[in-house]
């Protein structure tokens, strides 16, 4: 939804999405400011790439090098081999990679970005579906249906439902 709020009518957000930084477990990087002059890998054309290229967020330090790679798996290989100090990626991408390849990285507590995911409708859509969808998504969150669905696929499902403070 972020960056497109004025382009569509939105139902939701129904889930929170986090862009994060991950490091090797023994890294001395614990917060975003520790990335100053460090080397970081991202997948090209992703939110983390834009965050580190644009540096419009005052929390984002000047890196030594930003390495943009065409394939997601490569950023984790670069991290594991020590070619970079950290990676920027979608949190679930990091978690899934660790599961798939039985490896461990440490995700920094401070996220790069937290955004809401919603359902977009055309601005001129007047069928009332957007409002019905928004109401249904909220009911599903309140009655626990969303939690039951998310916990089938993601660890720590409750944090993905923390959408009230996103400001939409």
Where are these regions (language model features)?
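Beta->alpha turn/N-cap motifs
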Residues: 1-2, 25, 43-46, 71-72, ...
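Short helix-initiation/N-cap motifs at beta->coil->alpha
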Residues: 66-77, 115
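Ligand-binding cleft/hinge of the Venus flytrap
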Residues: 11-12, 48-69, 98-102
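Solvent-exposed, polar/charged alpha-helical surfaces in well-ordered, non-transmembrane soluble domains
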Residues: 20, 33, 50-54, 73, ...
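A ligand-binding cleft/hinge motif common to bilobed small-molecule-binding domains
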Residues: 1-7, 51-54, 78-113
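Acidic, polar ligand-binding/catalytic clefts
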Residues: 1-34, 106, 111
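Periplasmic-binding protein-like
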Residues: 15-23, 99-138, 156-168
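Extended ligand-binding regions for polar small-molecule ligands
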Residues: 26-29, 33-47, 119-158
